[in-house]
Amino acid sequence: MKMFFTVLVTLFVCSMIIGICEGREIPVKCKGSKQCLQSCKEAGMTYGKCMNGKCNCTPKG
């Protein structure tokens, strides 16, 4: 059971790291995530959200 938990935590951490690395910040200022959707689609990404006043785009959810 301990081995299963260790593997599960390791996979979770790796998936979080991969998800962060795949994201891309684009030079578009925003106040809400809705403002980023079109800009992220034009940049070739699927999803976008506003973080710290700039659009952060990711290829998957």
Swiss-Prot record:
Keyword annotations of the record: Amidation, Disulfide bond, Ion channel impairing toxin, Potassium channel impairing toxin, Secreted, Signal, Toxin, Voltage-gated potassium channel impairing toxin
GO cellular component: extracellular region
Residue ranges of coiled coil: none
Record bears the keyword Disulfide bond: yes
Tissues showing expression: Expressed by the venom gland.
Keyword Signal part of the UniProt annotation: yes
PROSITE patterns from the UniProt entry: SCORP_SHORT_TOXIN (PS01138)
Signal sequence range: 1-23
InterPro entries, A to Z: Scorpion_toxin-like_sf, Scorpion_toxinS_K_inh
Modified residue annotations for Lysine amide: 60
Localization terms from the record: Secreted
One Pfam family matching this protein: Toxin_2
Single annotated GO MF: ion channel inhibitor activity
Disulphides: 30-50, 36-55, 40-57
Function: Inhibits voltage-gated potassium channel rKv1.1/KCNA1 at nanomolar ranges (IC(50)=90 +-2 nM, reduction of current by 30% at 50 nM or toxin).
Family stated for the protein in its record: Belongs to the short scorpion toxin superfamily. Potassium channel inhibitor family. Alpha-KTx 03 subfamily.
Domain comment as written in the entry: Has the structural arrangement of an alpha-helix connected to antiparallel beta-sheets by disulfide bonds (CS-alpha/beta).
Protein name as catalogued: Potassium channel toxin alpha-KTx 3.18
